[in-house]
Amino acid sequence: MADARKNNVTIKVGMIGDSSIGKTSLMVTYVQGSFDEESTQTLGVNFMEKTISIRNTEITFSIWDLGGQREFVNMLPMVCNDAVAILFMFDLSRKSTLNSIKEWYRQARGFNKTAVPILIGTKYDHFMTFPREDQEEITKQARRYAKAMKASLVFCSTSHSINVQKIFKIVLAKVFDLKCTIPEIKNVGDPILEYIDR
């Protein structure tokens, strides 16, 4: 009789970035499969889990979402410690949130130097209505940051379910050192999806 027992692996993923950029929406959309228009601002830390099965292994994503207001920065260690991946998130429609990534990255790396970094641009559905030159400028800056961070870069929209599942597939591939088979998307104006081979 075949052994029916499954291996269980838990992967802690931290989500950080400025407030009101869509961190909680991404987490809820991924875990529950639906977009919540009424998502409220996170005060402190949010936490959700989602378990998926791959072959004979059950993988639980333990997702930690830090409220983006500066008064919660003292909770950053709770989100970063033991995380195997950190999603550094910004709102594609607000350039100031991309500029903040440098400081978030610096602080997070103080608590965790080994987590796989992924740079996530949210609200792609708003971004795609921007003039072409604005899209080019923001994409160029995001690529510069991703390169400096040695991070994969993904633009997503939780309200339109664009690239949400793929973010966590990239996390899996990077954490377990698997070949990422998701096709990359590189054209400005499209929902960018570029990953680096570690």
UniProtKB/Swiss-Prot annotation:
UniProt xrefs under InterPro entries: P-loop_NTPase, Small_GTP-bd, Small_GTPase, Small_GTPase_Tem1/Spg1
Q: Where is this region: Small GTPase-like?
A: 6-198
User: Which SMART domains is this protein grouped with?
Assistant: RAB, RAS, RHO
GO CC annotation terms, alphabetical? mitotic spindle pole body; spindle pole body
Residues that hold GTP according to the record: 17-24, 65-69, 122-125
The protein's role, per its UniProt record: GTP-binding protein essential for the induction of septum formation at G2 and pre-START stages of mitosis. Acts via the cdc7 protein kinase pathway.
- Protein known as: Septum-promoting GTP-binding protein 1
